[in-house]
């Protein structure tokens, strides 16, 4: 009787030690992770804004797309039911047939809807309508600082900023400040950039990409090795830069035009999260 009892007690003790050891290790790990570090990071954190103006008009159809659209429209017409206007046209034709025969009565005249008159009026309105031009004055002048260009494409905002003693094109950015999230840094960038003239919708709280670079030697001597930039996407809703903003310091570029401004390594990281559908 004593032997089984002893084996049971020893088994419980071993189980307790196995149960206790992970929790003890986890407590030590949490304590070590929570310990503050006295060494400051040599990397500065920045939040960058990828502000896009979405297309304002649809793209031109390719010849194949036009053929497919015509085919689908023809199929829809063949399978569709009569619309209210077509039913009225049939009813009017029936009333006119009655008028030619002896079955027509004077009281039916007030119910006749002159469909042809309506169609003539609609035709006149259609002829007076003039669609807006796809090619704007900014397209003709190649004014890339204007927001009213390439209406059927996505445009990305680029700004010219100082990096050491050089003027470099980049996405708008600002340095992260303690107490704010990186998205709040990007939101602050938008507010200070346009003096609250631009309203945008940010897409998520997580960055869509990042880029790391080292400062020039003159700046690196101050204790910062380089910067880590975290990009946040946003869609432009309303607003534009005021006329007082210095020209030549910002452009609205399409995806193909980014290579005219951005450095190759920076451009490679930006293109990874850009979609031009």
From Swiss-Prot:
Gene3D superfamilies: Nucleoside Triphosphate Pyrophosphohydrolase
Modified-residue entries (N6-acetyllysine), positions: 228
A GO cellular component annotation in the UniProt record: nucleoplasm
Main location: mitochondrion
Keyword vocabulary terms for this entry: Acetylation, Mitochondrion, Ribonucleoprotein, Ribosomal protein, Transit peptide
Database matches in InterPro entries: NUDIX_hydrolase-like_dom_sf, Ribosomal_mL46, Ribosomal_mL46_N, Ribosomal_mL46_NUDIX
Localization: Mitochondrion
GO terms assigned for molecular function: structural constituent of ribosome
Coiled-coil stretches noted in the UniProt entry, renumbered to this chain: none
Subunit structure: Component of the mitochondrial ribosome large subunit (39S) which comprises a 16S rRNA and about 50 distinct proteins.
Family: Belongs to the mitochondrion-specific ribosomal protein mL46 family.
This protein's name: Large ribosomal subunit protein mL46
Organism of derivation: Bos taurus
Gene encoding the protein: MRPL46
